[in-house]
Amino acid sequence: MSTNPFDDDNGAFFVLVNDEDQHSLWPVFADIPAGWRVVHGEASRAACLDYVEKNWTDLRPKSLRDAMAED
């Protein structure tokens, strides 16, 4: 049975962000998907999760936050 590389506590990761300011952990061996950019790492999974918890405090997409701010 294979393991999920996204759950590897010993793996190296990046934190990615898209245009909606949504964050994702991404294993360093995998290609960065179109529309995403690296904002943290290469680092441990724990360090990347810590970065996400500290920096992605509003889970609403950017477009929704912007629309609500206009009201």
From Swiss-Prot:
Organism for this UniProt entry: Mycobacterium bovis (strain ATCC BAA-935 / AF2122/97)
GO process terms (BP): siderophore biosynthetic process
Protein name in UniProt: Protein MbtH
Protein family according to the UniProt entry: To M.tuberculosis MbtH.
GO CC aspect terms: cytosol
Coiled-coil ranges (or none): none
Function description: Could be involved in mycobactin synthesis.
Pfam (any one): MbtH
Name of the coding gene: mbtH
UniProt-listed SMART domains: MbtH
Gene3D superfamilies (UniProt xref): Structural Genomics, Unknown Function 30-nov-00 1gh9 Mol_id (3.90.820.10)
Signal peptide: none
